[in-house]
Amino acid sequence: MMKLTIAGLLLLLAACAPKMGGRISAPQEPLSDSTFVLVLKQMDPFENDGIKVGSIRSVDNGLSVNCSYYEVIEKLRQMARRSGANVIKITRSELPDRKSTCERIWADIYRVPDFRKHEGEIFWHPGRKLTWDDFKGTPSTTSYFQFGAVSSCDLKLESNSVSILKKPRFYTEAVFNCYVSWVRPASRNNAEMLAHEQCHFDIAELYRRKMQQQLDEAGFNAFDMQEGVKRINKDIGRQMGKRNDAYDEETEHGLNKTRQREWERVIAGELDTLKRYIQHR
């Protein structure tokens, strides 16, 4: 069973550039550019079980360029990798205002043995399959009582900074929400149920790629992007909801093993046809 939401984080009609800095007190061996770095928000729980590498920040003095949240986070990830850190814990953030058009972020960075135990959200990745340990929520006692597990997935959308002279670029994510997703204790050894939930996450990624494709091909500008993005967002959400309903119905929530395997093959094939839109993190 899956609960689904779609969130749009949109449209800064300005231009700005971040100033990167920080203090590295315990540098570690640098990580490769392809190594995943976990980003934890201010409200996300975190207990350090590794080494605090230092502190980093992205600020700005006013109007410049390339400083949407997504762009800033990618620059902070690069700084963390160079210092050997695999976790970024945001300690303070400020939204654009009259003093600055940039997203400003301060964070501590850490090197931990296993970043997965600290995840509150999981961004879809072909090499990162769900485990029951990722289902960190408390099972419901009032709803979904007939299900052994519930997974919660979001599609998230953000644009870069946009001006009359600067065309929009869009960033999309398929996200698994660990603390909203849950599994009942009796189902923790059920590998087939886990495969069913993984396919729900794969369906979310499929429609993220469809959304990314439509956004990239739309050719929006600063004047028409607001309504155009809303239209695509709504349409993709409707399609994905129907696909998930059909998946649950035809597989009988994973109990029909033959149909379950068929759905897994179909979704894997559709993902492959849109592999150019995979998100590298």
Predicted regions and their residues:
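Sec-dependent signal peptide recognition
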Residues: 2-9, 196
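C-terminal motif of bacterial Sec signal peptides marking the signal peptidase cleavage site
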Residues: 13-15
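Bacterial signal peptide processing site
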Residues: 17-19
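Compositionally biased P/S/T/G-rich terminal and signal peptide-adjacent segments
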Residues: 21-58
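Short, well-ordered alpha-helical segments
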Residues: 51-93
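Mid-length scaffold segments of soluble, non-membrane domains
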Residues: 87, 167, 175-212
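Pro/Ala/Gly-rich low-complexity, hydrophilic intrinsically disordered segments
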Residues: 105-131
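Metalloprotease/metallohydrolase-associated module, dominated by Zn2+-dependent proteases
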Residues: 122-185, 221-281
